[in-house]
Amino acid sequence: LTAIPLDGDQPADQPAERMEDGESTPNHPWFDPVKRCCTALCSRYHCLPCC
């Protein structure tokens, strides 16, 4: 078994963004575009993934 580090440009390297509340995660007020995650109120019904 060989482990290869992920390089960040493949779909498997970036978790799918789920939009269960009908809002687009990148447009969410708590979304940090630099870190590509949310900074507050992390839950399955709000901004995902959490920082």
From Swiss-Prot:
Residues 1-4 form the signal peptide. Keywords: Cleavage on pair of basic residues, Disulfide bond, Secreted, Signal, Toxin. Its main location: secreted. Disulfide bonds join C37-C51, C38-C47, C42-C50. Expressed by the venom duct. Residues 1-27 are annotated as: Disordered. GO terms for cellular component: extracellular region. It is found in: Secreted. Residues 5-36 form a propeptide. GO terms for molecular function: toxin activity. Belongs to the conotoxin M superfamily. The cysteine framework is III (CC-C-C-CC). This is Conotoxin Reg3b. The lineage of its organism: Eukaryota, Metazoa, Spiralia, Lophotrochozoa, Mollusca.
